[in-house]
Amino acid sequence: MEHDLERGPPGPRRPPRGPPLSSSLGLALLLLLLALLFWLYIVMSDWTGGALLVLYSFALMLIIIILIIFIFRRDLLCPLGALCILLLMITLLLIALWNLHGQALFLGIVLFIFGCLLVLGIWIYLLEMLWRLGATIWQLLAFFLAFFLDLILLIIALYLQQNWWTLLVDLLWLLLFLAILIWMYYHGQRHSDEHHHDDSLPHPQQATDDSGHESDSNSNEGRHHLLVSGAGDGPPLCSQNLGAPGGGPDNGPQDPDNTDDNGPQDPDNTDDNGPHDPLPQDPDNTDDNGPQDPDNTDDNGPHDPLPHSPSDSAGNDGGPPQLTEEVENKGGDQGPPLMTDGGGGHSHDSGHGGGDPHLPTLLLGSSGSGGDDDDPHGPVQLSYYD
């Protein structure tokens, strides 16, 4: 059963209506017994009674129905009891109109019409209540036709003025109200059980709040996932280097030793394509155009008299070799020297040779930002490509 979202949380369950007190129940049973005795006396006293006898008998039957409702289902006194009381008042009005004349008769007729309209309204309200309790359209149609059939039979009883017909009509009215009572007893009890069952379920507002907390927790988890998965400062720790295959040419600015590694390489892995001194070479057959070492010689020539350690492209002589394969230069100074056997590339110690170009190469290089490569705290990028 759907709840209104604007309604607050369900309150405590209302205790069921208890049975009537023993004194009131005994009094109702006594009145019911007296009403039955009076009704039987009126019906069986004169089998050829007139219209007033029919109305008296019908009025007593309505009182009997009201007492039955009070004894068994007091909660139905409002719709069914009000209908019976209104019918009883109309019956008494008809008994009074039977001997009236003139303006009193006219006023009585107006009141009679007004009472009939009230009876019709209460009957429609009763059918609507049955519909809300789960009655089908065929059950409502059966109650509606039975009600109007009893009215027609009552009019026929007033016309015939026979007590046996009056007895039959009164019993039909009693049967109609008993059928409504029995139907409402079973279906109303089931409806009450379903209502209590629905109240025990969580309220939609509470479910909305729970879903809101759940969505907040999900969003917090998503936010935590973003923090953990590394959308922070710097490049990702593991990435794929999509540089030139095989360690292609380095077209950046020349190294501090005024050499470029793009030309044909000498045995010492240097290029002699830089500008040469127009003067003849020194006796040591070396070129003094580049930055000179402490021995006043340049390592760019083919006949370096002294053994020389592999120089760092950044100007650092000697030192332990850097475990790097290839650095992607993006506009800054070239990184540490390359000590790889990259296929098709060049290196300081391996010359034109190299490993198999089809094998994958593990790259251990800088972040590619072109910054200072001597920073020990800079992020390291692991690259892997074929």
From Swiss-Prot:
Record's domain comment? Two regions, C-terminal-activating region 1 (CTAR1) and CTAR2, have been identified within the cytoplasmic carboxy terminal domain that activates NF-kappa-B.
Gene symbol here is LMP1
Positions of region (Disordered):
194-386
Q: Family assignment?
A: Belongs to the herpesviridae LMP-1 family.
Q: What does this protein do?
A: Acts as a CD40 functional homolog to prevent apoptosis of infected B-lymphocytes and drive their proliferation. Functions as a constitutively active tumor necrosis factor receptor that induces the activation of several signaling pathways, including those of the NF-kappa-B family. LMP1 signaling leads to up-regulation of antiapoptotic proteins and provide growth signals in latently infected cells. Interacts with host UBE2I and subsequently affects the sumoylation state of several cellular proteins.
Q: How does it assemble?
A: Interacts (via PXQXT motif) with host tumor necrosis factor receptor-associated factor (TRAF) proteins TRAF1, TRAF2, TRAF3 and TRAF5. Interacts with human protein ZMYND11; leading to negatively regulate NF-kappa-B activation. Interacts with host UBE2I; this interaction induces the sumoylation of various cellular proteins. Interacts with host IRF7. Interacts with host TYK2.
Q: Where is this motif: Interaction with host TRAF proteins?
A: 204-208
> What is the designated name of this protein?
Latent membrane protein 1
Q: Does the keyword Transmembrane apply?
A: yes
* Statement: the UniProt record of this protein carries the keyword Transcription: no
Q: Spans of biased composition, class Basic and acidic residues?
A: 210-224
- Stored InterPro entries: Herpes_LMP1 (IPR007961)
The portions of this protein that span the membrane are 24-44, 52-72, 76-96, 107-127, 140-160, 164-184
Q: How is it modified after translation?
A: Ubiquitinated on the N-terminus.
Keyword terms of this UniProt record? Activation of host NF-kappa-B by virus, Host cell membrane, Host membrane, Host-virus interaction, Inhibition of host innate immune response by virus, Inhibition of host interferon signaling pathway by virus, Inhibition of host RLR pathway by virus, Inhibition of host TRAFs by virus, Inhibition of host TYK2 by virus, Interferon antiviral system evasion, Membrane, Oncogene, Phosphoprotein, Transmembrane, Transmembrane helix, Ubl conjugation, Viral immunoevasion
Q: Which GO terms describe its cellular component?
A: host cell membrane; host cell plasma membrane; membrane
Q: Which residues lie on this side of the membrane: Cytoplasmic?
A: 1-23, 73-75, 128-139, 185-386
Superkingdom, according to UniProt?
Viruses
| Organism per entry | Epstein-Barr virus (strain B95-8) (HHV-4)
Which cellular compartments is it found in? Host cell membrane
Q: Which GO terms describe its biological process?
A: symbiont-mediated activation of host NF-kappaB cascade; symbiont-mediated suppression of host JAK-STAT cascade via inhibition of host TYK2 activity; symbiont-mediated suppression of host TRAF-mediated signal transduction; symbiont-mediated suppression of host type I interferon-mediated signaling pathway; symbiont-mediated transformation of host cell
Q: Where does the record place the region CTAR2?
A: 351-386
Low complexity: bias regions: 251-267
Mapped to this chain, the residue ranges on the Extracellular side of the membrane are 45-51, 97-106, 161-163
Q: Where is this region: CTAR1?
A: 194-232
